[in-house]
Amino acid sequence: MSNHLSSDSDISSTESMLCGGIAGMVSRFCIAPLDVVKIRLQLQKDGSRYYRGIFQTMQQIVRDEGVTALWKGNIPAELLYVFYGATQFVTYHHVNQVINAYNETAEKWKISSGAQSFIAGATAGAGATIATYPFDLFRTLFAAQGAKNCNVKNYTSLFQTFKLIYKTEGPLGFFRGVSSSIISIAPYMGLFFASYGRVKDSLDAFSNKHHDLLVSYNLPTKGWQEATAGLCAGTASKALVFPLDTIRKRLQTQGRMDVSYKELSGKPGVQRLLDSYNPFVMARRIIVAEGCRGLYKGFLVSLIKSAPTSAITMYTFEKSLSILRWWKAQGKSLEA
């Protein structure tokens, strides 16, 4: 089975965008509950023991707010994942094309396939993050304010949240914490795409070599490579960059979960609530107040979330591409 994310893939920009958007939408809906749990754990300050682990947190949310609370903030999150997936995959495709063109003309200092996947993945991750960051911000705020120990209800809808942040902080308010997001997501996606390609190629080779053995044990020979490669790549990449994700969530909610944020909207006094846009300052605060382990709050649930997310995303991307091409082929055959 071919790897449609390889540097020499024949996939088009339209296919990348459409299949990337579908993959983002499907994966988001499946992992939304784990994302809500992760955000609650990440934003819980040291000393509070209201949420004490994945399953207890999930049970507590359902008990306090109902089952639908596990999909709280899902509308902005779905928009985030659809646009993020589409932007990420089409950017990855175009960066690969640029590097291919460079390698064809370069006499020396050519970029290796592994480095190419990392560069294309990192660029795609950074570009998609910037393009969709306001949706990520809204998703975090909606998920955070649902907590039982949070008495703030500043945000009621996408439009109301947009107006409130714009009035209080101006256009730059929609991008608070974006630097830490880029710092965390760029290497994460670079590592993800680089390792995904390697792992999938190895799994394809294994499947081809041991085809008869797999058949003899009634094991599938196709369809599992994408999900398995995505799972492995997502797990390894997430483990390396998680502290930066915690810093990003703290920057996004800092001050905005304060009762007086809404009251001070449009007034100079609001700046006292928004005293740090610096990820390094935020990292120092977390370490001083909570120790280094504060940077890893919600790590287990994030790891559990990122693995199936990556698996579902890559599987859906490859399968939706296969369906799209089958549909196009059927159309051509009917015309003929």
Curated annotation (Swiss-Prot):
Q: Which Pfam families match?
A: Mito_carr
Instruction: Provide the GO biological process annotations.
Output: thiamine pyrophosphate transmembrane transport
Q: Where are the Solcar repeats?
A: 11-98, 112-202, 221-323
Transport: is it a keyword of this entry? yes
Name the UniProt key words of this record, in alphabetical order. Answer: Membrane, Mitochondrion, Mitochondrion inner membrane, Repeat, Transmembrane, Transmembrane helix, Transport
- The answer to whether the entry has keyword Transmembrane is yes
The molecular function terms in GO held by this entry are: thiamine transmembrane transporter activity
InterPro entries assigned: Mit_carrier, Mitochondrial_sb/sol_carrier, Mt_carrier_dom_sf
How this chain sits in the membrane, per its record, is: Multi-pass membrane protein
Q: Any stretches that span the bilayer, and where are they? A: 17-37, 66-86, 118-138, 177-197, 228-244, 298-315
An annotated GO cellular component: mitochondrial inner membrane
What subcellular locations does the record give? Mitochondrion inner membrane
Instruction: Enumerate the PANTHER family for this protein.
Output: SOLUTE CARRIER FAMILY 25
The family assignment reads: Belongs to the mitochondrial carrier (TC 2.A.29) family.
What is this protein's function? Mitochondrial transporter that mediates uptake of thiamine pyrophosphate (ThPP) into mitochondria.
Name of the featured protein: Mitochondrial thiamine pyrophosphate carrier 1
Q: Which organism is it from?
A: Yarrowia lipolytica (strain CLIB 122 / E 150) (Yeast)
Gene name, please? TPC1
